[in-house]
Structure formats: C-alpha cells, structure tokens
C-alpha cells in the first residue's frame, strides 16, 4: 500500500475481529475495496502476541468462533496455538491474508466534511538486524 492508495474500508488490526470484519465485508460488499493495517509482523492479535505456557480462551470457541467458519475442534475452550491456526486458516481460505499490510500502525485519523473522506496516517516499521564488530 502506498500513500496514494485509496480503499473504501480500512480495518485496523488483523486479529480475530479484524479477520472477521474483512471476511464479512468481502462476502456482503464484494464491490468495496479494503485493507487491514496490522502493527505487528503477523496476523492473529492476542493469539500471536502472547505465547506463554497454558494460554487459552476464556470463552468457548463455538461462541467466540466465526459464524461463517464454525469451530470444529472438539476442544471448546481452546489453547492459543489452536486459535491462531484457526485465524490463519480462515484468512487464507477467504482471501483476506492478501489484504493485510503488516508492520503498519494507524496513528491518526482525520475526517474531512468537505471531501466526505477519512485520511488515516500510519507508520510503517522495518525490522533490521545489523551485524556489529566486536
């Protein structure tokens, strides 16, 4: 995405809810263009960020999961890695993954009444590993 690109809908975050919003948008408004801004280098939100032993949902996945892609795992209270896998599979299956702009954090949004247009400012992060001499 460049600074001149325009989309009809900008979704902030590629976690469970952001992926859901993108799938619903693509299914119900197929003529609308969209992008997802994800501040991190991977989708999944909480389920990618936190990796401590024993992390799991506190809600059953039959309720928390997507209506358009029901949770089929018999483990209703799912562990973090299973939820992350579910999110990634869903994003790929529905073509949402191609719309995610990683390492891009929305920092400002300004509404123009005259233009009937939001202008969103985002910063993009590049991760570098630089060797040094001892």
Regions found by a protein language model. Give the residues of each.
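N-terminal Rossmann-like FAD-binding beta1-loop-alpha1 element of flavoenzymes
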Residues: 9-35
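A conserved short coil-to-beta-strand element within the FAD-binding core of flavoproteins
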Residues: 102-116
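Helical element adjacent to the flavin cofactor pocket in flavoenzyme catalytic cores
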Residues: 84-100
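Short, compositionally biased segments
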Residues: 122-125
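A short, basic/flexible loop-to-alpha-helix module at the beginning of a structural domain
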Residues: 1-6
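Conserved acidic E/D residue at the C-terminus of a beta-strand in Rossmann-like folds
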Residues: 36-41
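Single conserved hydrophobic/aromatic residue that forms the stacking wall/gate
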Residues: 127-134
